[in-house]
Amino acid sequence: MEPRVAELKQKIEDTLCPFGFEVYPFQVAWYNELLPPAFHLPFPGPTLAFLVLSTPAMFDRALKPFLKSCHFQTLRDPVDQCVSYHLRSVTEKFPEVHMEVIADYEVHPNRRPKILAQTAAHVAGAAYYYQRQDVDADPWGTQHIAGVCIHPRFGGWFAIRGVMLLPGIEVPNLPPRKPPDCVPTRAGRITLLEGFNFHWRDWTYRDAVTPEERYSEEQKIYFSTPPAQRLALLGLAQPSEHPSTTSELPLSLLTKPQNSRRARSWLSPSVSPPVSPGP
């Protein structure tokens, strides 16, 4: 890894990892090459970026302390606001580094996602993005089958939280890092994709590999609860109709994506994720 990348990665990790996050560097070009022009990140190909994901430890190390410290007068989505707080803390801690942050849930005015998180996780080498195209002679016919990322240490017990872009820092010599193919067999991939698409409520697809750590029962209850009911579950008041703070504004300062080429498989409805079953 280039010394400059290693230095920046260490700085970001020192800020985020104690709270249950992981960080992976990648080049914007690796992401853009897999997607149609409408989804490209509008930066030169060698631009450095970091993928950020949360591990099972984030719930206790970040979310609970965040709720106790009352960083927001109004809570709308505690997990998203907690993640936003920690990502912003990186940009505030290193003001000399220009960073632009895109959270996994951010969309353009036309509702197009600002980042395809699973594609970013794959190119960063963080988690393998298993899709229908990875199953030879698949058995699903005309059924819609969405893809899912599997982490080599946590299986499906993690969540992709966003991307940190560093405009002006280019790393053309950064070596690509392939994600570990931890579900290498056809049968295993069929079981994984069917579990994710048809039985995600039972959590079993997340054990596609034996994980080092799973979500606690407390986390599972929280993420199984419909979002509109999660504040009540935590004993928190429902939000008012009015925005509370500027901290709840979108994270990204991105401009309109530039044009370029690529394969539809990473975006087509047949492989795009369904409504999320939870982090």
UniProtKB/Swiss-Prot annotation:
Co-factor(s): FAD; FMN
EC number: 2.5.1.151, 1.16.1.6
Record carries keyword Flavoprotein: yes
One Gene Ontology CC term in the entry: cytosol
Catalytic activity: 2 cob(II)alamin-[cyanocobalamin reductase] + 2 hydrogen cyanide + NADP(+) = 2 cyanocob(III)alamin + 2 apo-[cyanocobalamin reductase] + NADPH + H(+); apo-[alkylcobalamin reductase] + an R-cob(III)alamin + glutathione = cob(I)alamin-[alkylcobalamin reductase] + an S-substituted glutathione + H(+); apo-[alkylcobalamin reductase] + methylcob(III)alamin + glutathione = S-methyl glutathione + cob(I)alamin-[alkylcobalamin reductase] + H(+); apo-[alkylcobalamin reductase] + adenosylcob(III)alamin + glutathione = S-adenosylglutathione + cob(I)alamin-[alkylcobalamin reductase] + H(+)
Compartmental location: Cytoplasm, Cytosol
Record-given protein name: Cyanocobalamin reductase / alkylcobalamin dealkylase
Lineage of source species: Eukaryota, Metazoa, Chordata, Craniata, Vertebrata
Gene name for this UniProt entry: Mmachc
